[in-house]
Amino acid sequence: KEGGDLVELVKRMYNKHSVSDALAYLASKNITTVDKAIETAIAAKEYTTTKMNDVKLLPLSNHSLLSYFSSRRIDITIGRMYCREIHYKVEQKHYYGIAFGNLSEGHEVRNPYFKGCIGHKDITLLAHTFNEWQSGCLVFEGFMDFLAYMTLVKQQDRWFVVESPCDYMILNSVANIKRALQYLDRYTHIHCFLDNDQAGRKTVESISNVFEYRVTDESFRYADYKDVNDYLMRKR
């Protein structure tokens, strides 16, 4: 089904009139999933919000989306607190997902089959206390890691949680690092909870090069795991 959906999606998005034309395009761009097709189009600025109609943001209630949180061991109450449910149409086909807002009023969108962004890509910055910025900030790569961290706070995982109150920054992509640096300058303590991969380590290095002693790499807390959400899912 994924293969058929992918070909149909490419035909609609790129005005390919035949299956063979769509397949040739997929091969030329090394696209193998619906997710990759949409991400490639967004990157090329060919798949814009003008092609999305009837965009609606609602309280999160869809059973399959809540089940997705459960499959990632995210506390559903926390998920509902920080996320909304988004519905939209592309070429009259209905899509929906979990929406997480950013500073440019765009939204990161997730469902079990799709990972992307609607609107402008940007960081998300959340105050620990309403209208009151803290001296410390926790930095996450994606919002699922942030939600996983908040779930660990609720579980009172003392090994994992930073004791002092901090604000929260979600990069939503390591490509947003320059934007992030502008906002991190206000903080005296910066705690990096980034992915245990090359991109994550490079991002910590970039932040440390600018803010030096203010930065703590917190990845030792989940050294045997890919990221914060992986720790939550697999910890004993």
Give residue spans per PLM region.
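TOPRIM fold recognition
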Residues: 4, 135, 151-236
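Alpha-helical elements of the RecA-like P-loop NTPase motor core of helicases
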Residues: 8, 147, 205
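Short, basic/aromatic recognition patches
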Residues: 75-93
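Phosphate-handling DNA/RNA-contact segment within nucleic-acid enzymes
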Residues: 88-183
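Terminal peptide-recognition signature
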Residues: 10, 69, 141, 149, ...
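Serine endopeptidase catalytic core focused on the charge-relay Asp
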Residues: 66-78
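Non-catalytic accessory segments of DNA primases and related replication-initiation nucleases
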Residues: 1-68
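Helix N-cap/coil-helix junction residues
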Residues: 16, 74-75, 137
